[in-house]
Amino acid sequence: MSEIVFRRAGPQDVALVAAITDAAYAKWVPVIGRKPKPMTADYHAAIRDHLVELAYLDDAAVGLIELITAADHLLLENIAVDPAAHGQGIGRRLMQRVEQHAIEMGLPVVRLYTNKAFATNLGFYRRLGYAIEREEPYKEGFTVYFAKAVGKP
């Protein structure tokens, strides 16, 4: 596989970020009966206020991460892989990038959350060493919160 190259998203990338996110999350609409939260996000604000990085493979945008820095952890607000690029290890590489950012920022923990109905996501995060911290009701389902220690406290 070619090397994945990362680039910070700018205001010119709002439509691209939204398109990758919509493509990645579209399969979940029939599962939960509505658009998942990332499909309704304000990506103008996200790009302005958070670290949003696009992942490129062979000059094509294939995924993204959106990170929010907190005092004691790095929150993965969104991760999305273009369905056309599935099966190439891009999701795993994006997660490595998230953890790398946390370590470089001196943050000891990466946190994330997902819908409990997204079974493949739950398994993916568990395989990467993320542990469930808690579950909370959200709309008609539950949100599952994960965390992983990645650096020194």
Residue locations for each model-derived region?
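A short beta-loop-alpha structural element at the N-terminal edge
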Residues: 4-19
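Hydrophobic adenine-recognition pocket in adenosine-nucleotide-binding enzymes
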Residues: 9, 79-81, 114
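Alpha-helical elements of Rossmann-like donor-binding domains used by nucleotide-donor carbohydrate transfer enzymes
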Residues: 16-20, 42, 93, 97, ...
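Conserved GNAT-fold acetyl-CoA-binding loop/helix
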Residues: 18-49
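C-terminal "cap" of GNAT-fold acetyltransferases
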Residues: 44, 52-53, 108-131, 135-153
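Conserved beta-strand in the GNAT
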Residues: 54, 60-68, 75-80
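A short, glycine- and basic residue-enriched loop/turn
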Residues: 64, 68-73, 87, 115, ...
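Conserved acetyl-CoA-binding loop-helix of GNAT-fold acetyltransferases
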Residues: 81, 87-100, 126-127
